[in-house]
């Protein structure tokens, strides 16, 4: 319930709702990272169309207030959500995930519903049949379209709009201080909600990856796992995470000037800056790095030890060195080799175009804003349509 916070900010039932576009986020703060990365983009949208962040959880509501200047409300139950939507003239709702509670909002018939997701990756969850519930689905590029074509029955491509990745137009201040050392970033994903979406390398290869990176001379090693790795309840993941943290912290104590560090809640885009090479899993992190730093080597870990399957399901692995049971033992040498000679630069550039197109700087943001404008115009056209004779009262 939201009894400990105002029902809304700057609005009470019966007064105008302060928003033309809703950003709907129903989950608790553990998933807030999904919304967080979009907030600067939504702040740009707010300049043309007032944006209202609708939350369903009181702690999320409070945290959103610390993250953005956007207006926000907390509506803990369905009756209050229906009242909010009924009292306002909200033209569109935007969704950043596939939360089951999205369907409470999707019941509203006088808004156009836009799904944007919270990243671009080759995880199974990125091509959910839930996409059919939305009027528009904004995707990064051709790879996302292929993913949906292959996964969905009666896929209607007309509702899917490639826009790139607007979040990657942002340039956050770097988290890491300058160093003369080369920086190896290990940024694994979490274990997912089920086995099909479990791509983490933490419990399978994580300690070996950290040890291999730390064995390189003259490097700074940064461990930046997905935030949900640090809070994982999976015994294997939790134990391996503690082991990796211990390895990095022990190396930092032995060599204080090296700059080895563990980062948990920092913006991964800000961590990228200053890194020389990335080791990651099948996740949005690797693709974001590919887009922003196509000139730097990339390693992709495979917990399933199925190279053919990985190459088929995660095409980015074709332009990267793969870390699996067969290669993790020689990882130190492979890292040294890639830092000395980058063998996959041309392949990464081609793969970048496949996933994201070839947008100019800030072009993705422009495409996103144009896609929202088009959706709002479509809604306005629908609103003004004449009723068919059969639908009119006698």
Give names to the regions the model predicted.
Residues 329, 333-394:
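C-terminal amphipathic helix plus adjacent low-complexity
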Residues 1-86, 382-394:
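N-terminal pre-catalytic "stem/leader" segment of glycosyltransferase-like enzymes
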Residues 104-122, 202-209, 294-305:
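A short, gly/pro- and small-residue-rich
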């Amino acid at each position: 319930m939201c009894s400990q916070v105002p029902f809304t900010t700057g609005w009470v039932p019966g007064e105008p709702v302060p928003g033309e576009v809703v950003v709907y986020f129903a989950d608790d703060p553990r998933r807030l990272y999904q919304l967080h990365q979009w907030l600067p983009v939504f702040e740009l949208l707010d300049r043309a169309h007032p944006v209202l962040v609708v939350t369903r959880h009181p702690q999320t509501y409070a945290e959103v207030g610390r993250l953005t200047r956007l207006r926000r409300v907390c509506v803990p139950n369905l009756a209050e959500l229906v009242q909010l939507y009924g009292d306002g003239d909200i033209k569109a709702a935007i969704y950043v995930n596939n939360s089951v509670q999205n369907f409470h909002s999707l019941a509203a018939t006088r808004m156009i519903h836009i799904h944007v997701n919270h990243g671009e990756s080759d995880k199974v969850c990125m091509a959910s049949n839930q996409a059919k519930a939305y009027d528009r689905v904004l995707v990064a590029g051709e790879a996302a379209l292929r993913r949906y074509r292959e996964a969905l029955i009666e896929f209607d491509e007309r509702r899917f709009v490639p826009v790139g990745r607007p979040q990657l137009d942002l340039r956050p201040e770097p988290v890491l201080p300058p160093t003369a050392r080369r920086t190896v970033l290990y940024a694994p994903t979490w274990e997912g909600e089920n086995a099909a979406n479990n791509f983490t390398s933490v419990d399978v290869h994580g300690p070996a990856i950290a040890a291999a990176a730390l064995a390189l001379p003259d490097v700074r090693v940064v461990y930046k796992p997905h935030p949900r790795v640090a809070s994982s309840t999976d015994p294997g993941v939790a134990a391996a995470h503690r082991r990796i943290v211990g390895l990095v912290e022990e190396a930092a104590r032995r060599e204080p000037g090296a700059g080895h560090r563990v980062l948990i809640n920092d913006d991964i885009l800000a961590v990228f800056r200053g890194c020389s090479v990335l080791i990651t899993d099948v996740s949005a992190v690797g693709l974001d790095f590919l887009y922003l730093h196509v000139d730097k080597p990339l390693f992709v870990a495979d917990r399933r030890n199925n190279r053919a399957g990985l190459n088929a399901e995660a095409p980015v692995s074709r332009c990267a060195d793969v870390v699996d049971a067969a290669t993790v033992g020689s990882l130190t040498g492979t890292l040294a080799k890639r830092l000395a000679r980058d063998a996959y630069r041309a392949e990464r550039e081609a793969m970048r175009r496949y996933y994201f197109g070839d947008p100019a700087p800030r072009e993705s943001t422009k495409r996103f804003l144009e896609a929202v404008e088009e959706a709002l115009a479509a809604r306005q056209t629908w609103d003004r349509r004449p009723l068919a004779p059969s639908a009119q009262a006698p």
